[in-house]
Amino acid sequence: MTTLDLTRAELALIVLYLNKAEARDKICRAIQYGSKFLSGGQPGTAQTVDKNTSLARKVFRLFKFVNDFHGLISPVPKGTPLPLVLLGKSKNALLSTFLFLDQIVWLGRSGIYKNKERTELLGRISLFCWLGSSVCTSAVEIGELGRLSSSMKKMEKELKADDELYRAKLQKSNDRTLALIKSSMDIIVAIGLLQLAPKTISPRVTGAFGFTTSLISCYQLLPSRPKLKTP
């Protein structure tokens, strides 16, 4: 391939990536938490960017609760242990509730819904739902990693480490490990936003962890590169 062809291919991937509403949301999330880290909770330009970006992001999430509600009522893969099923459904229910309540919070903070006290209350409830969903996600990923590890050990004993199925399981294990790291860090972000441990998890710590998980989310949404044809 020529340099021009490679450039076109790279630009096509960028366009594909930026066409995803979820990707744009996560880029804005990185800006939001990066600003929170810079402001350290103190008034100024960085804090203004943090608050404005947070409000703008809520528009990306309008009706997004339908996705997790669909996951809640969808059947699970056969052979999934009951504890993992319950944790997965709990995650879907909590995340769907968070996203639904977040719409009301957006209405309140944009001035459409006038009850400020109820808006703040629903905002805290929604964050607790997100905290709970992050805990459930971490537990699910730990359980699934255990299942993958057991399956891979059996394959290693059968001397099939070079098998395509083994490599696919290894990639899946890596993906779940990254998801576990992200969800564990999101727990800290949620605790910081709720100010449950203000002495330990300051706005700057919350911003640092939020910025990191945003970058992880951006990475997870990257489109796979097409295989290049060799001459």
UniProtKB/Swiss-Prot annotation:
Membrane topology: Multi-pass membrane protein
Family per record: Belongs to the peroxin-11 family.
Keywords: Membrane, Peroxisome, Peroxisome biogenesis, Transmembrane, Transmembrane helix
PANTHER family in UniProt: PEROXISOMAL BIOGENESIS FACTOR 11, PEROXISOMAL MEMBRANE PROTEIN 11E
Transmembrane segments: 92-108, 203-222
Quaternary structure, from the entry: Homooligomer. Interacts with ARC5 and FIS1B on peroxisomes.
GO molecular function terms noted in the UniProt entry: identical protein binding
Function of the molecule: Involved in peroxisomal proliferation. Promotes peroxisomal duplication, aggregation or elongation without fission.
More info: Can complement the yeast pex11 null mutant.
Triggers of expression: Up-regulated during sensecence. Down-regulated in seedlings by transition from dark to light.
Swiss-Prot/TrEMBL GO biological process terms: circadian rhythm; peroxisome fission; peroxisome organization; regulation of peroxisome size
Lumenal side stretches: 109-202
Full protein name: Peroxisomal membrane protein 11E
Cellular location(s): Peroxisome membrane
Gene Ontology CC terms: cytosol; mitochondrion; peroxisomal membrane; peroxisome
Cytoplasmic side: 1-91, 223-231
Keyword Transmembrane helix recorded: yes
Tissue and organ distribution: Expressed in leaves and developing siliques.
Organism: Arabidopsis thaliana (Mouse-ear cress)
